[in-house]
C-alpha cells in the first residue's frame, strides 16, 4: 500500500510500517538533523517542508497518490511532560495534518500522538 509519512522525524514510523509490508513512497519533516538521519536509513525521498504550509504540502503529497497517510504531529503542547500550552503553535500542526488528509482523501489514515491530545481544544476543532 502506497504510504507517505508526515512529521517523519528520523523514521521510526516509516521503519515499522516498512517492516509490516507497507510501501513508503516518501516522507516529510521540517527538522534538518532528523532529515539527515532519515536519509541515511531509507532510499525513498524525504522532503524538507513545514507542514503548516498546507497548500504546498497538499501539492507535494498529491504527486505520490498515497493510499495511506501516517504521521505523528508534535506532542509537546499536549504532553503531560510539557507545559500543555496549546498557544505555543505546535498544536496547530495537528489541525494542519487534518487539513492535508481531508484534501488528499487517502483510503486510510493513522495519526499517532499522546493521549492528552484527545482532550485538547485543537482535537475538538479537528
Curated annotation (Swiss-Prot):
GO molecular function term, any single one: DNA binding
Task performed by this protein: A methylase, recognizes the double-stranded sequence 5'-GRCGYC-3', methylates C-? on both strands, and protects the DNA from cleavage by the HgiEI endonuclease.
Species name: Herpetosiphon aurantiacus
Catalytic activity: a 2'-deoxycytidine in DNA + S-adenosyl-L-methionine = a 5-methyl-2'-deoxycytidine in DNA + S-adenosyl-L-homocysteine + H(+)
Keywords: DNA-binding, Methyltransferase, Restriction system, S-adenosyl-L-methionine, Transferase
Entry EC number(s): 2.1.1.37
Top-tier EC class: transferase
Protein name: Type II methyltransferase M.HgiGI
Listed GO biological process terms: DNA restriction-modification system; methylation
Catalytic center residues: 75
Taxonomy, superkingdom: Bacteria
Keyword Methyltransferase belongs to the record: yes
Domain SAM-dependent MTase C5-type, residue spans: 1-126
Family: Belongs to the class I-like SAM-binding methyltransferase superfamily. C5-methyltransferase family.
Gene: hgiGIM
Amino acid at each position: 500500500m502506497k504510504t507517505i509519512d508526515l512529521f517523519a522525524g528520523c523514521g521510526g514510523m516509516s521503519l515499522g510500517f516498512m517492516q509490516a509490508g507497507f510501501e513508503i513512497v516518501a516522507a516529510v519533516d521540517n527538522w534538518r538533523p532528523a532529515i539527515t538521519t532519515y536519509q541515511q536509513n531509507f532510499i525513498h525521498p524525504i522532503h524538507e517542508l513545514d507542514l503548516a504550509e498546507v497548500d504546498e504540502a497538499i501539492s507535494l503529497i498529491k504527486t505520490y497518490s498515497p493510499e495511506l497517510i501516517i504521521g505523528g504531529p508534535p506532542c509537546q503542547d499536549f504532553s503531560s511532560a510539557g507545559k500543555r500550552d496549546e498557544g505555543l503553535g505546535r498544536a496547530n500542526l495537528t489541525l494542519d495534518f487534518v487539513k492535508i488528509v481531508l484534501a488528499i482523501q487517502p483510503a486510510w489514515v493513522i495519526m499517532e500522538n499522546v493521549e492528552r491530545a484527545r482532550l485538547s481544544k485543537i482535537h475538538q476543532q479537528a
